[in-house]
């Protein structure tokens, strides 16, 4: 069964097809999943992700069932595989936002319904699909190639972008603090994909080096959910990594800024630059709705072929 746990499991053609279908559904909504049911399991808070999934399945003609971790027997120690074997037989899709990626993998092993990663500590693939749709809409993909810089933490967003850039053949530069590292296993995967796609991938600790000649600039919060106790330390470590006017001036003249939100002005991005690119950033957030629609349709079609 096809799940959506990481973009590593998807081909270039499948990723681009998802983005193109999302664009079509944005222009012409259709009820393609009449009476289908989506279970939404959250171990972490969510604003945009919950809204995107709940609206997506509803507008496609189905219905959503919201389940926080406190609503489930998982919170009392029931094995993940047992929960998966119950929920996965009652619904058509399962969306999960989890603390540990292993929870997703375990759930997917036992679920009879496709499982979607709505965020884990390693990956945030639905967000990257929304980013790709936004890049397409702002005409920052020329001949199938985008020039992208990611500035910030070597987190789930960085990992997901590294993977998709390598698969799609993008020019992609990462800038992270000196004591931060990319997962060796994810980096190895990306390098192998880059040999196939022709992607140009670089890693540095200098944001200006990464930003040079880029059309798309991506940043993310320095303090992810669950890292609140590390805030003071991380702010010190990320000193100099803010995206401000000086940083954006190094990128190409009409470069756009993307941020998955929530944004913390004065830390990863300046107030001035955030507001300057607010139209793009909030359309990026809105685009999550349409890529989720396309994803649900894709998984439903894949399941129908089995």
UniProtKB/Swiss-Prot annotation:
It is found in: Cytoplasm. The gene is arcB. It catalyses: carbamoyl phosphate + L-ornithine = L-citrulline + phosphate + H(+). NCBIfam families: orni_carb_tr, PRK00779.1. This is Ornithine carbamoyltransferase. It comes from Campylobacter jejuni subsp. jejuni serotype O:6 (strain 81116 / NCTC 11828). It is an enzyme of class 2 (transferase). The keyword Cytoplasm applies. Pfam families: OTCace, OTCace_N. Its EC number is 2.1.3.3. Disulfide bonds: none annotated. PROSITE patterns: CARBAMOYLTRANSFERASE. One of its GO terms (molecular function) is ornithine carbamoyltransferase activity. GO terms for biological process: arginine biosynthetic process via ornithine; arginine catabolic process to ornithine; citrulline biosynthetic process. Pathway: Amino-acid degradation; L-arginine degradation via ADI pathway; carbamoyl phosphate from L-arginine: step 2/2. One of its GO terms (cellular component) is cytoplasm. L-ornithine binds at residues 156, 220, 224-225. SUPFAM superfamilies: Aspartate/ornithine carbamoyltransferase (SSF53671). Carbamoyl phosphate binds at residues 46-49, 73, 97, 124-127, 260-261, 288. HAMAP family: OTCase (MF_01109). Keywords: Arginine metabolism, Cytoplasm, Transferase. Belongs to the aspartate/ornithine carbamoyltransferase superfamily. OTCase family. Reversibly catalyzes the transfer of the carbamoyl group from carbamoyl phosphate (CP) to the N(epsilon) atom of ornithine (ORN) to produce L-citrulline.
């Amino acid at each position: 069964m096809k799940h959506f746990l990481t973009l590593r499991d998807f081909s270039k053609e499948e990723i681009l097809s998802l983005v193109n279908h999302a664009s079509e559904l944005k222009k012409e909504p259709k009820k393609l999943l009449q009476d289908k049911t989506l279970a939404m399991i959250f171990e972490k808070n969510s604003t945009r992700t919950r809204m995107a999934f709940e609206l997506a399945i509803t507008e496609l003609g189905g219905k959503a069932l919201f389940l926080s971790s406190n609503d489930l027997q998982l919170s009392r120690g029931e094995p993940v595989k047992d929960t998966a074997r119950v929920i996965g037989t009652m619904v058509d899709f399962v969306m999960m936002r989890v603390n540990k990626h292993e929870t997703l993998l375990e759930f997917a092993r036992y679920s009879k319904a496709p499982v979607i990663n709505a965020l884990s500590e390693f990956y945030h693939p639905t967000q990257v699909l929304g980013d790709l749709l936004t890049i397409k809409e702002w005409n920052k993909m020329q001949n199938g190639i985008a020039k992208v810089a990611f500035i910030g933490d070597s987190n789930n967003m960085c990992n997901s972008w590294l993977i998709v850039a390598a698969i799609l053949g993008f020019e992609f530069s990462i800038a992270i603090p000196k004591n931060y590292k990319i997962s060796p296993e994810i980096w190895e995967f990306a390098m192998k994909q880059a040999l196939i796609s022709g992607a140009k991938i670089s890693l540095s600790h200098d944001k200006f080096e990464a930003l040079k000649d880029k059309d798309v600039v991506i940043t993310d919060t320095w303090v992810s959910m669950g890292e609140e106790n590390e805030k003071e330390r991380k702010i010190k470590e990320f000193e100099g990594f803010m995206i401000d006017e000086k940083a954006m001036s190094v990128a190409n003249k009409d470069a756009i800024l993307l941020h998955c939100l929530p944004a913390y002005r004065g830390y990863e991005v300046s107030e001035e630059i955030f507001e300057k690119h607010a139209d793009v950033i909030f359309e990026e957030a809105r685009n999550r709705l349409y890529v989720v629609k396309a994803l649900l349709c894709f998984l439903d079609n894949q399941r129908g072929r089995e």
